[in-house]
Each structure stands twice: as structure tokens, then as C-alpha cells.
């Protein structure tokens, strides 16, 4: 598991630089004794001393809160039931009772902690309910204050501490109830399943060993938990980092023993108790509970920790052996590797992108256009098929081999043909590798071409070999050795078949002799460095397309085997090859070589020159190849024309309608909800207006520029009102919105919403105000990241009733007048900061020892924005990983220039 996922309760507080800088005026002796915390809002406070749950719950010297009394009552309830219930009933009850508390822990706490981490949900709920507000809920506040004050020490002051800390103290009391009851209910279930084995005297030594091992595991479990608590303290034990900040994370103590010791070796006691109980039921319940705890780790705890302590990309222009003030103290072995001397000052970011480029891990990052990935999938598929293929009859096996050969035939000629056709028209393969993989700036743009062609060669050769091998498989399954070669046409069939196979081999060898590896692998579809002229030598002196003779072996094998399946396979292969030549290779040759292509093959010219009296015969000879193709094409065209006359208009209409629906489907995936009380509101009193851009002074905004909207509404307007941005023309109605905003919306009272859920806070009514106004600013993910014209709509009560509209506003992007390095870089200097939310920490131009063109990312969305902007400005596609790998304006500008040069080469040919 990666380091970003290994923070669970591995938290040892360490002084934060920012916190220390704010506390420089603190007297020196106090700094060593006092622990300081910091809220998300920046408020610094002294963290009081807390006590562990065992001490506060069972030590009579400590006062008990009402929640402590509830906890003790539940514990006593379990003990009483254990002694009064029959053994079988006790087992069933405590099984479900433990499942309840385990679910409350893993699912309940997981859900609550996730919402608190993302949206500060617990704190906001306390605010919404007014539990700690002296004016709104004084009785509840005083009760909570007493509960917390009784549990804390003398250094605790309820009124002096921030809301986040007091909310955390209240939260941890609820957590104590869950944790303690979860533990005891498991123990009660295990004890109810305990039995003394029969034949104790015979198996005494074995049982004693089992019990001894169980007690050792329990003791080890207790030691791990105790040591872990000593390291992380209550702050880490009760997930304090989702409420406030108390320091950075380091690894220490028991956390060097095993990964996630609290959730791995920290559950050894489960298996110790299973050994002592000697029950498979306890063992399987332990395994299920342990698995649920790991699910809690993976799905609930790791994501917020990773989001809090790790950025997606940090492009640091430092030598890899330089010391780093990171947020995490590394493992000693890792640290020794990092600190080893290097000859060059290459950053770790650059090294990672140099040696690792979307590598396949199991099946993650799979790319079937990479030859190694395609071969991996084939090996896995064939291995699975061999392993799970049942015993089949000879007839079924023959049909399976035929389908196998047919599939490879279609993959080779049609599948690869379509890829090659796309490469000829749009440089599809080169674009794919250029978009998804990072290449060094020093390769002059050739890296993508070389890799695309290298992978194409491997895939093409693999496909061609599998085409022949699969065909031979069908022949082998259908062939039977003749009993008498002199009877019938057996000898003739084998002779003609062998001759056709020999003709195929000769034609292929002659073709390769003329074409070489460049022509054999269709190099002119990829590379422009080679000369663009044709030489008709060898077999090409006589035939324009000797590849047409390549199917001779298939017909020869059909003769030899005498199988209709092989014959049909040969015909299908012949038609597929004809389609490939006429639709893929010949159009590309005409585009590339133009008039230098000859019309007649060599042997046709000879017949035309030396036998004019046999002109009609010559046409028939020429038709041996070309005419067959033409007649087949005419037949297919006639068939399609007949189909088109009967159903063509309807099919075209359906296709066109489908395209339109698909284009609008994302926007229209919304169930329009309208308000029933709309008649009680006067829409004329609502007003929304677009503030002009600070850059242009008009309603035109650069892509990524924040858009400010002013609104005015009656004082009694709903607190759930919201404003959305929509493409002009997306909604036909001006009274009801029927398309999705695609995330481009904001509530008019953002402080009263938890993400997309209104908190339902009540406002204090005012008799003097008739209207209320405010401002919302669209930025980041709420902005449209596609150029075009948009309109603003003010909606009522969380529904889709439109109260006011304004627009249009235009989203534009400046395109450089010429494709030079300076113009491209200047465009990026404007685009990139806007895509990074204009966060100065992500573009540290003045940071020490840093390339001034470097930039960083907080989220993958920012990298996607840059990709979208580059596509709209320069018409070049990049995957987010490529932009993250560069993370530098100069590098990105060079990449764009090289890409444009590669993609524009011969575009007008």
C-alpha cells in the first residue's frame, strides 16, 4: 500500500512551522509544555490535557458524564444477559449485537468522518442545531458544557476553546460508546461459544498450547494498542485531524512494526480469543469483523488523510538528495535511499516521469494499442480459455476453431485496417501516444512517432502470425488423411493446394524483398523522413497489388482439407483483404504519391503493346484481378442501394436523431422539479445581473476567469435559492429550467449549504427590509471550461423555477497569431494560472531554487482544465498525466510546438 494510504492512526504530533511562527511571542518555558492546535479558520488555541477512555470510564476518582453512565449501563446490560441467557440464545444474541456495534463503527463512523473531512459536516450540524449557541439553545449548551468540563482537567475552559475542539470532545464521547460496546460484545460472543473439549486428558498438551498461543496473541494485541495510543495520543485515536490541526505526521514506535498496526497486528486478539474458544464460528466472525475494519481503512479513513496531507503533484526543482521539509517522516530505509548521492541534480518528479510512464500494474493502466499490453491480455485470455474450456465434441471443437480463425482474420484486416486508416487521415496512433505518454523535450518530437510505430509493428506481426496459425488450426481439425490417393481427385486436390501454398509463400517473399521492413509494416503511414517515390521492381514490375495473391495459400489449404469451413474462411479473408486494399492502402498511396502511381500493371502493358488484336482478351486478363474487385464492388453497391431505397431515409433520420440526442443527453439527464408555492412569489422583484469582467470591462470572460453575479430578491425569498450557468439555447423555456447545470451552480447563501445539501438554518426575521441582495462568484469547478455563450438563471427554493435571467455572457480564449515559442508560452502564462484557480502557492515564481516556470497541482481537475484549454487554443490533445509530468510552462510550450509540427506535417498532401 502506498505511503499516501498509510496514515491511519500513525500520527505523532510534530510542531507545525506555520503554527510555530504564529506563536513566537509565547514565553520559552511554555513552548515545551503546551501543545497548540489550529482550526481550519486559522484560530490558534492551547490544547488541554485529555484522558483515555479506560481511565475516565472505570477510575472512580473521575466524574462520570451522562454518556459515561450510558456506556456503563450498556456494558452492565451485556454482562447480565450473558449470565441469564441460555448458551444457544446467548450466542445468537451477541452475534447480532456485535454486528450492530461493528456496523456502527465501520459504516456509521466511516460515513460521519468522511462527511466531516470533506464538508466539516459534524461542526456544521452542531452550528445548525445551535447546541453550543448560548442564545439559541442555552439549556443544551449548558448541559454539554457540564458533560465536557467534568471529564476534562483543570486546564480546560469551555468558553475559551473554539467550536471545532468542543465538537471533537463531544464526538469522542460518542465514539467511546461505540468502541467499548463493540469490544465487549465480541468478547461475550466468544465466551458464549467457548467449550471445554471432550477427551481433555488425551489432548491436554495440544489444548494447553492452543490456549497459551491465544493468551500470547491477546497480550500482544494489548501491547500494540497501548503503544499505538502512546504515539498518536487521543488526537490521532479519535481522528482529531478532521476537526483541527495539531501537527504534522511522522512514523514512530509501533508504527514501524507493521503497516497500519492498529488494523493489522492490532487485531491479533481476535484470533487469540478464537484459539481459546476453539470455535470456527468465532474465527469466521473475527475474519469478517477484521475485513470490515480494513474496509473502513480503505474507503473511509485513507481518502481524507491522503487528501489532507498529499498533493497530486509537486514539481520540485531540487536535487533528489536535497533535504525536504515534507509533511511525513520517511521510513529509515527509504530515507537512506533518497539521501544517497546522485551525479545529477534531477528532481524526483522528473525521475518518476522518466522511468515510469503509465505502466501496467496487473490490469490497471491497460492500453491495447501498446503491444506489450495487447500480448498480456491475449496470454491471460488464452490461459483462462485453456483452463476453463470443458470437454467438447469434435464437431464443436471444429466450430470453435473456425470462429477463432474468423476472429483473427477480422482483427487483422478490419480492426488493424481501421486503425491504419485513422492513422492515415488523422495520425490517430501518433496522437494517442502523444496524448497519453510523456516524452523528453530533447527527442524533437520523435518519441511519440517511434513508440507508435514500434507498437504498431509488434501488434501487426502478432496479428498476422495468429491469422495464419488459427487458419492452420481449422485445417488440422478438419483434415483427414486419404485412404487411397489414387481414388477420385485426392491427389489432384493436394497437388493444386500445395502449389497454391507455394505461390503464396513465393509472392510474400518477393513482396518483402521489394518493400523491405519499411513497406512491410506500412512505414509511410507513420514516418516522413523516408523518400516519397515509388520503384516498381521485383514482383511489383508485374502486379500492382501482389498482396492479392497472398490469399492463395488459404484456397490451397481449402483444397487440401476439402473443408467448406476452410473455403468460406478463404473467401472471407479474400474479401477482407480487398476491403483493406481499396479502403485503406490505395487511398493512402494516392494521397501520398499522387500521379506517380501507375494505372496498369506490367503484364497488362505487355499484352496491350504486343497483342493489339487481342485487346478484348487483354481486358479479360486484366480483369483477372481488377475486374473481380470492380464487379464485387458494384454488387455490394447495388445491394446497398436497394436497401437504401427501401429503408435508407428512415435509417438516416434515426442516425441523425440519435446523434442529436447523444449530444444533448448529458445536459438533459435531469428530472425537473418545480415548486408548488411559486404563485406566492413575485418574480418581478427578483433580479440577477452579470458583473463585467475586470479584464475586459464587458461581459466577456477569459476561460477560467471568475464570474461575479449580483442578485436581488425579496426578503422572504427561500434560503434554498440558487443560481446556475447554462449554454445559450440549452433551455427553450424562460420560466422552467429543464437541463442540468453540469455542476455550474451556486447557492445564493453558500454559508447555509453543506455542499449540495441545504442545512436549513433559520434566519432572524426583519420587519424593515423589503429586499435582500448579495453576490456569488463562479470559479474553479463551477465555471464553464468550454468557450461559448452562456446565460445566468436564478432559481427558486432548490427547484427549477426561473425567477430571473441575465445574459448572454461570452467565454473566450485568446489564440496566438503565430505558432512561435514566445507566443505559445505567453498564452500558457495566462491560461495555466487561471486553470490553477490563480493560487499563488501553485505557481511559486519567486521560490528559492525553483524554475520560475514550474507549477503544481492540488487536484486532478486542475490538470484536466489545462488539457481542455490546450485543446481549445492549440487543437492538441493531452492526457492529464502528460501535463502533470511536465508541470513547467517552457516544457509544455515546447511540447505543444513539437506536437503541432508532427500533426501538421503533410496535412495538406
UniProtKB/Swiss-Prot annotation:
GO terms for cellular component: endoplasmic reticulum membrane. It is found in: Endoplasmic reticulum membrane. PROSITE patterns: SAM_CHO2. GO terms for biological process: methylation; phosphatidylcholine biosynthetic process. The chain crosses the membrane at residues 66-86, 92-112, 174-194, 200-220, 257-277, 280-300, 374-394, 400-420, 456-476, 498-518, 552-572. It is a multi-pass membrane protein. InterPro entries: Phopholipid_MeTrfase, Phosphatid-EA_MeTrfase_fun. Pfam families: PEMT. The keyword Cell wall biogenesis/degradation does not apply. GO terms for molecular function: phosphatidylethanolamine N-methyltransferase activity. Belongs to the class VI-like SAM-binding methyltransferase superfamily. CHO2 family. This is Phosphatidylethanolamine N-methyltransferase. It comes from Laccaria bicolor (strain S238N-H82 / ATCC MYA-4686) (Bicoloured deceiver).
